[in-house]
Curated annotation (Swiss-Prot):
Signal peptide: none annotated. This is Spore germination protein GerQB. The gene is gerQB. It comes from the Bacteria. Keywords: Germination, Membrane, Transmembrane, Transmembrane helix, Transport. The chain crosses the membrane at residues 11-31, 45-65, 84-104, 116-136, 142-162, 188-208, 220-240, 270-290, 300-320, 331-351.
Length: 360
């Protein structure tokens, strides 16, 4: 593929912010209940192990990208041929569309439940997608800049991670490791959607200056995410009883309801509003990634592809009008992502490595 001009690239350290931004999305608000439902008070172990597995996958992704010296679109076709590679590119780009749609519509559900139950989904979707269109048309550097501020601005809420500690009962965590390893592995499923998004590296790798040197920042970013998610899981398990957590769909928001100020009665309104700074770069990244991927695969300019993708996600807002449908979308997205990332990418790496060795 063509070398990206340096004026369109970002510094290697920006990968740290790009990965954290897309990992700490809407899943962070309620991932605890799903894992706890599967493995109870050992859910924090599942979260920790899944975070470690993501670091392994980041290493594999960098092996693929460094050897292929391009993005996943070009690498798939170079390694597997035009048709098989093209099919796998279609699957990956479809998954990225679903990832963006799931993130946006799950956040819309949060807004409905916690703030504005009567507002139409299409109104919120239209406002977000309009902003995302403006951001994405500015190019990758603008998207990356929004991703940076998507970490900096919400960081003012970090104190909410510690306020509930005074009400935590850490005896809820015992006995530790009462579930089998297989059960804990199954519990990792509850963390998939929260951690996913790091695979966007497969698309924006060519836009990083001295991309090979950015790997350490990717690992650091996932380390931070893993620590945050594991801590939140431990805090949630200590704050809620098992029965209470089973009914807490948005566990994090339920916890911070206890925070009150003389001038703010419903502090969770602030949380949901500020969380938009996480969601905006999340959706923008996916829109940029899909439009860029289609440009590389089919030669269609991004400015023509982008409105079509946005229209598709907008139309979904008329159909994703209840919890069951959004849950189903979450499940499909997680399963497709798991198979592509944890099954296909290692196989691709092995085939690619074997081909390189045979050529030598």
């Amino acid at each position: 593929m063509k070398q990206i001009p340096i004026e369109y690239q970002v510094s290697p350290y920006m990968v740290f912010f790009l990965i954290i931004t897309i990992q700490m999305g809407v899943g962070m608000l309620g991932f605890e209940r799903i894992s706890a439902k599967l493995v109870g008070n050992d859910a924090w172990i599942s979260t920790l192990l899944f975070g470690i597995s993501v670091n392994v996958m980041i290493w594999i992704i960098y092996q693929i990208l460094n050897q292929g010296n391009g993005d996943i679109i070009a690498i798939n076709q170079n390694v597997l041929g035009k048709w098989i590679g093209g099919l796998l590119n279609f699957i990956f780009l479809s998954y990225i569309v679903l990832l963006g749609a799931t993130t946006l519509h799950t956040y819309i559900e949060v807004v409905h439940v916690w703030m504005f139950p009567s507002i139409s989904s299409w109104v919120i979707a239209g406002a977000f997608l309009g902003l995302c269109y403006y951001i994405v048309t500015g190019g990758f550097r603008v998207v990356a800049g929004i991703g940076f501020f998507g970490i900096v601005i919400p960081s003012i809420l970090i104190f909410t991670f510690f306020y509930p500690l005074q009400y935590a009962d850490f005896r809820n965590l015992f006995p530790i490791a009462q579930h089998s390893f297989l059960e804990i592995m199954k519990g990792m499923k509850g963390n998939m959607f929260s951690f996913f998004g790091f695979e966007m590296l497969l698309l924006y790798y060519p836009f990083i200056k001295k991309a090979r040197t950015s790997q350490k920042y990717a690992h650091y970013a996932n380390l931070v995410t893993t620590i945050v998610y594991t801590y939140l899981m431990i805090l949630t398990l200590a704050f809620f009883s098992e029965k209470q957590l089973a009914n807490a769909i948005w566990a994090y928001l339920s916890m911070i309801k206890i925070i009150q100020f003389p001038f703010i009665e419903r502090f969770e309104y602030i949380i949901v509003s500020v969380w938009a700074f996480f969601i905006l770069p999340n959706v923008s990244f996916t829109l940029w990634g899909v439009s860029r991927g289609i440009k590389e695969a089919l030669g269609i300019k991004q400015k023509y592809v982008l409105p079509v993708i946005i229209l598709f996600i907008f139309i979904l807002s008329f159909f994703l009008n209840n919890r069951n449908k959004i849950n189903l979308l979450n499940t499909w997205t997680g399963q497709i992502g798991f198979v592509y990332i944890y099954v296909y990418l290692p196989v691709l790496w092995l085939i690619q490595t074997a081909k390189i060795k045979l050529r030598r």
